[in-house]
């Protein structure tokens, strides 16, 4: 590695029983390679599935706070991609969700690169063994009470036994749906541009769209503003309150994500315009 002076290994210490051992292993490994090492402590009050979401949010907030134009390299592999796509399908998702983990993404003013997304976990473990590189594994990854672990330990191995090319096929699926979603969003962005005024989206313009197209326009508009996007039931409430109520009604709807990965949003009607306000409690 030529740019070791600019390369920093960032470790997240989740302050559980094995955290100190994990941090020591990573620090020693980086010292051997002359790589700068930093550790950030993350303390989470909740447990279970809530812990995973809260920890993910704190990690992303730390990555956002890094110096502008940082390039963040993460180690997600193709087995992680299978897990993510299946998990999203089970929870209910659309094109964007099925497109999975992106190879390149933005977090704040920084860029995330995931160069191993097409590599299998098996290939990575084989490389580590061949090169005699020691590694540690989080014992909580074996706890199948976590939904993702259940998929990883119980479901995905059985799928692989039946369909040996699942890694390549899911990778192909995510690339296709990513391109399809990009085309779809390009169409919706043109609609948003037509409907925009200085405050938000015009109610009359939105009413000219059919119900599904209207809901997709509103979702993408909010997504572009980096706020919480409504789920199916919240979208039905928006439809009823803003587009099926009396013209003189002035509805206000407030919603947020339970994992707080994005700020909450308040939707209201002001002067025949659908207006969005952010809130973060």
Regions found by a protein language model. Give the residues of each.
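Core alpha/beta nucleotide-donor-binding catalytic domains of modification enzymes
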Residues: 1-154
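Short helix-capping/linker segments at secondary-structure and domain boundaries
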Residues: 2-3, 160-165, 222-230
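Conserved anion/nucleotide-ligand pocket segment
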Residues: 152-154, 158-170
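Short, structured helix-loop boundary elements
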Residues: 48, 52, 167, 232-235
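AMP-forming adenylation/ATP pyrophosphatase catalytic core
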Residues: 8-12, 42-44, 58, 105-109, ...
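Internal, active-site/partner-interface "lid" segment
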Residues: 141-149, 167-178
């Amino acid at each position: 590695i030529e740019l070791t002076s600019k390369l920093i290994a960032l470790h997240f210490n989740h302050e559980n029983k094995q955290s100190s051992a994990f941090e020591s292993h990573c620090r020693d490994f980086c010292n051997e390679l002359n790589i700068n090492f930093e550790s950030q402590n993350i303390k989470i009050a909740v447990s279970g599935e809530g812990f995973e979401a809260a920890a993910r949010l704190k990690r992303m907030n730390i990555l956002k706070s890094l110096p502008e134009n940082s390039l963040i390299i993460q180690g997600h592999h193709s087995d992680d991609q299978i897990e993510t796509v299946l998990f999203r399908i089970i929870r209910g998702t659309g094109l964007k969700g099925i497109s999975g983990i992106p190879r390149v993404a933005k977090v704040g003013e920084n860029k995330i690169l995931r160069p191993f997304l097409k590599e299998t976990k098996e290939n990575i473990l084989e490389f580590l063994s061949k090169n005699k590189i020691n590694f540690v594994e989080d014992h909580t990854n074996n706890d199948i009470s976590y939904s993702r672990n259940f998929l990883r330990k119980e479901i995905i191995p059985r799928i692989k036994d039946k369909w040996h090319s699942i890694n390549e096929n899911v990778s192909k699926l995510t690339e296709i749906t990513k391109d399809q979603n990009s085309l779809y969003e390009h169409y919706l962005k043109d609609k948003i541009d037509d409907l925009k005024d200085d405050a938000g989206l015009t109610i009359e313009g939105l009413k000219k769209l059919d119900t599904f197209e209207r809901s997709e326009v509103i979702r993408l508009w909010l997504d572009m503003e980096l706020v919480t996007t409504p789920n199916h039931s919240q979208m039905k409430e928006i439809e009823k309150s803003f587009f099926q109520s009396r013209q003189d009604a002035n509805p206000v709807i407030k919603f947020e994500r339970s994992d707080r990965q994005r700020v909450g949003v308040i939707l209201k009607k002001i002067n025949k315009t659908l207006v969005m306000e952010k809130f973060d409690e």
